[in-house]
């Protein structure tokens, strides 16, 4: 099936950029040759800029963290939990310091033994604002922990 998708193009994975909730999502005043996603009135760049918890601002925080901490780009990388189908996790180590990145890619709360090992680490960023149950990752939760800083 993937072969047929590649030979027919990538249009099935694209839609016009959703800038705002105006006609055609603010993408064009003309007639777009690709259909605008019907959710453009609720999901668009303008609304993201109005929400301090949006993906836009989360990415800005991540970019700032990368500028502040060399460990984001330097040091050794070690993949963890390679057999776990729910959790993606890795550690970076640089100059005696460690960073754990952990993400739950499911809609379910899942146990994560790594969190107990890192409970004394500093939570640098998390996409949930309140603490969750110890040793558990909530649906689609991601976090970065620092140790040794």
PLM regions: where:
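Loop/helix patches that line or flank the sugar-binding groove of alpha-linked glycan CAZymes
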Residues: 1-99, 107-110
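Residues that form or immediately flank small-molecule/cofactor binding pockets and catalytic motifs
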Residues: 22, 128-129
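Ordered hydrophobic segments in well-structured contexts
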Residues: 87-89, 97-103, 125, 141-146
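Short, surface-exposed beta-strand/loop "edge" segments at domain boundaries and coil↔beta transitions
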Residues: 97-98, 130-134
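Surface-exposed beta-strand/loop patches in extracellular or lumenal glycoproteins
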Residues: 105-118
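Solvent-exposed beta-hairpin/edge-strand motifs
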Residues: 115-128
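C-terminal beta-strand-rich structural cap/linker in extracellular carbohydrate-active enzymes
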Residues: 133-149
């Amino acid at each position: 099936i993937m072969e047929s998708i590649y030979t027919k193009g990538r249009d099935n994975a694209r839609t016009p950029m959703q800038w705002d909730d105006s006609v055609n999502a603010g993408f064009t005043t003309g007639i777009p040759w690709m259909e605008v996603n019907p959710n453009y009135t609720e999901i668009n760049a303008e609304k993201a800029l109005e929400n301090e918890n949006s993906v836009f601002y989360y990415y800005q925080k991540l970019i700032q963290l990368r500028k502040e901490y060399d460990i984001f780009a330097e040091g050794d990388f070690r993949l963890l939990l390679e057999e776990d189908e729910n959790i993606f996790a890795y550690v970076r180590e640089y100059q005696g310091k460690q960073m754990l990145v952990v993400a739950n890619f499911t809609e379910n709360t899942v146990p994560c033994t790594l969190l107990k090992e890192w409970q004394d680490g500093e939570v640098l960023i998390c996409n949930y604002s309140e603490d969750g149950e110890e040793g558990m990752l909530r649906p689609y939760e991601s976090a970065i922990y620092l140790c040794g800083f």
